[in-house]
Amino acid sequence: MSKRDYYEVLGVERGVDEKALKSAYRKLAMKYHPDQNAGDTAAEDKFKEVGEAYAILSDPQKRAAYDRYGHGAFENGGMGGGSPFGGQGGNPEDIFQDLFSQVFGAGGFAGGRRRSGPQRGADLRYDLEITLEEAFYGKDETIHVPQAVACRPCEGTGAAPGTKPETCETCGGHGRVRAQQGFFTMERTCHICQGRGQIIRKPCKTCGGHGQVKEERKLQVKIPAGVESGMRIRLSGEGEPGTSGGPKGDLYIFVEVVEHDIFERDGPNLYCRAPVPMTTAALGGEIDIPTIDGGRARVAIPEGAQTGRKLRLRSKGMPSVRANGQTGDLYVEMFVETPQNLTARQKDLLRQFCDCSGADCHPESEGFLGKIKRFWGGEGDEKRPV
């Protein structure tokens, strides 16, 4: 079967530069890497194909020969005896590892060679809900976190007490094995030890051979005053234990402040809506506004106050967790409450007020009526819509 054009394999033009060539190869190699497509022979063939194409086109001498003679440059012993890797001992996996180690460091890709030595433990997440009042004052919270700890009976080895894990004979303790396929050498996770490099003949009954068990730990967490939803608190070294003597991971506590019945929050500022009796709004007066600290603030209402008017109470908001010593404000939006369930006398008094009130008492209404008249083209009924 004839081979595809190497440029076509990598999806690049013939004049592609080295940077774009490397980028195209990296994308395809990640897509078709055997460790990402276990058991998929088609993906494995693709991985070999892109590796072969990159081996030629990334070498200036071989690329020049390919551009001039095509695949014939590497047949009948030319340019390395028929192997596109030119007798240098290279293979698609080695090219892939060399390229990705430049980007991620040794072992940085999931399909890379097994990392040896101490490994840091995994980080943990804990979601914590608190009230707005708790966020205002801050608090010391006790949390219970389930996490993996080293199994005490086997001391974290996973082997039954009195026994030890044995080095895997198949991979020699490396966790990965190599298989020769023509001129390719493929590296895979060892199927005997599952990449651990060790075999446990007699597993520990307590942990089932895992070397770790789940326990619930009680921790004290200090929640700072002014904390907001979405903020996280880091407890260093309170995550999962490391392996082979590696350090513990960290515990991240994600805070969620639940909605409040009265106040809405925007950073350090608080907002609320306060009902104002119609008479107070008309004559002026005072109303009491609840504050987040559990107290009350007396607010002066000016004569003729209207719905939607906002009042600002300085330093009655939330403490700022980002700026020590600073406190936000409380913004109060008024809405005039229309009286309901009136008695006959109350209705009569309102009618008397209506009879003696003029345009000066309702400037907004008069202004609105004037706009309507101008919209209709005057006061005449002949131009009004039916």
Curated annotation (Swiss-Prot):
Q: Which GO terms describe its molecular function?
A: ATP binding; heat shock protein binding; unfolded protein binding; zinc ion binding
Span of domain J? 5-70
Keyword hit for Plastid: no
Q: State the compartments where it is located.
A: Cytoplasm
Tell me, in one coarse class, where this protein mainly resides: cytoplasm
Alphabetized, the UniProt keywords read:
Chaperone, Cytoplasm, DNA replication, Metal-binding, Repeat, Stress response, Zinc, Zinc-finger
Look up the record and give one Gene Ontology term from the biological process aspect: chaperone cofactor-dependent protein refolding
| Residue numbers binding Zn(2+) 2 | 168, 171, 190, 193
Its family remark reads: Belongs to the DnaJ family.
Q: What is this protein called?
A: Chaperone protein DnaJ
Organism of provenance = Hyphomonas neptunium (strain ATCC 15444)
Instruction: Please name the gene that encodes this protein.
Output: dnaJ
